[in-house]
Amino acid sequence: MAATVVRAALAGCFMLGAALANSAEVPPPAYQLIALPAGVPSEVLYSVALQESGTRLRGQIVPWPWTLNVAGAGYRFATRSDACRALMLALQTAGPSRVDVGLGQTNIGANGHRYSYPCEGLDPYKNLSVTAQILAEQKAKGGDWITAAGRYHRPAGGEPAARYRRAFAKHLSRVTGINLMANNP
């Protein structure tokens, strides 16, 4: 019995080591749990969050859940309640189409219907779920995940989507440990 347990533990360690050898950075568990049912690789979801809400913390870039972008200006808040108050004010002053929210910076004007109320976009799990849904929808239109990420950012395409693809590909390369080239369809 003990030998079976030891063999199973060694096999698990080997598999974990093999996975880590092929990946420069393992996405946090929430990204893995949310990405799988949506059919999105967790590395893609995590890389989008790094691109959208990444901030430097203790020398590393990490996604920040209480991030807003209002009319092109980024804001990070220490608490969800502070971010919610600022979000409600931003919706009144700038309008929903000029406000992005949360880890995936989902635009309230285009995607507000995916939330029960605006501040739900600051719930990290809900925001990641919405982000994964949008990514899956964009991937279903064709192309690879880099192309889908470009459409996630700007469905109309053009140079803003191309810039986003290049920046996203850098994050995805870091996360996967694979040097990726962003295509420009």
Located regions from the model:
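Catalytic glycan-binding domains that act on GlcNAc-containing polysaccharides
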Residues: 22-185
